[in-house]
Amino acid sequence: MSNQLSLGWPAPAKLNLFLHVNHRREDGYHELQTLFQFISHGDLLDFKVTDDGSLKLHSNIGNVVADSDNLILRAAKLLQERTATEKGAEIWLDKRLPMGGGIGGGSSDAATCLIALNALWQTHLSRDELAELGLALGADVPVFINGLSAFAEGVGEKLIQVSPKEYWYLVLVPDVHVSTAEIFQDPDLPRNTPKLDLDSLMSSPWRNDCQELVVKRYPQVAKTLDWLIEYAPSRMTGTGACVFGEFEQQQQAQDALAQLPSNMTGFVAKGTNISPLELRLAQL
């Protein structure tokens, strides 16, 4: 594969269809119950394998590349160290997802890097081994490596495959960065939602325990959600800032998007229980 370009590796966004905060552990981490679903919108990565062990990242967004702590480069380095491969890579990132939006952009990029380079470098790590590497980069990375919609609990490391309905979504992107760390450190965050079994969770009304706090702290999120909820059942994903509305038909979501005020941005995407990354991997 050396010096050949391998194009079009998707790094899809995810939505938290529900997010419950059960309690804060003594080590500071929070016990959660959440449901992840992929959507048909995300970043794209291209790779060229090299023989000199070097790692280079190019992007359509300069500050992504300038950050030496970039998750893509960290993922590639971890895979090199874990497998002792002498191969390197030149990587191109087409960044389409907002940073700090609660839709998993950085985590998804890291997962796609691990999956793609494991295949292109022929390092032959199993999916479980890749997920273990991914967990060192972020709690959400194993979900993207797993490649299937999943119920997660604990600190996000226990995954059970589920297949929620694949709605069309209108995802809106408020012009604000919400710090996940700040939200989880906030004394006003509810941390006492009782743990429920999966069947009960899947049949109950879905909500996000972080939403009320984020809406109070970030007026832009509140305004965006207030607008969207007039068109469809809507809530926040992750710790925000992105919010999403559920639609039965693509045209309904497109019609709502057409009404979007000029000071708001968003996109329409399809929920999918199999990651677009799986389809790309199958093409090798």
Curated annotation (Swiss-Prot):
SUPFAM superfamilies: GHMP Kinase, C-terminal domain, Ribosomal protein S5 domain 2-like. GO terms for molecular function: 4-(cytidine 5'-diphospho)-2-C-methyl-D-erythritol kinase activity; ATP binding. ATP binds at residues 98-108. It is an enzyme of class 2 (transferase). The active site is at 14, 140. Gene3D superfamilies: 3.30.230.10, GHMP kinase, C-terminal domain. It catalyses: 4-CDP-2-C-methyl-D-erythritol + ATP = 4-CDP-2-C-methyl-D-erythritol 2-phosphate + ADP + H(+). Keywords: ATP-binding, Isoprene biosynthesis, Kinase, Nucleotide-binding, Transferase. GO terms for biological process: isopentenyl diphosphate biosynthetic process, methylerythritol 4-phosphate pathway; terpenoid biosynthetic process. It comes from the Bacteria. Disulfide bonds: none annotated. Its EC number is 2.7.1.148. InterPro entries: GHMP_kinase_C_dom (IPR013750), GHMP_kinase_C_sf (IPR036554), GHMP_kinase_N_dom (IPR006204), IspE (IPR004424), Ribosomal_Su5_D2-typ_SF (IPR020568), Ribsml_uS5_D2-typ_fold_subgr (IPR014721). Pathway: Isoprenoid biosynthesis; isopentenyl diphosphate biosynthesis via DXP pathway; isopentenyl diphosphate from 1-deoxy-D-xylulose 5-phosphate: step 3/6. HAMAP family: IspE. Catalyzes the phosphorylation of the position 2 hydroxy group of 4-diphosphocytidyl-2C-methyl-D-erythritol. Belongs to the GHMP kinase family. IspE subfamily. This is 4-diphosphocytidyl-2-C-methyl-D-erythritol kinase. It comes from Shewanella woodyi (strain ATCC 51908 / MS32). The gene is ispE.
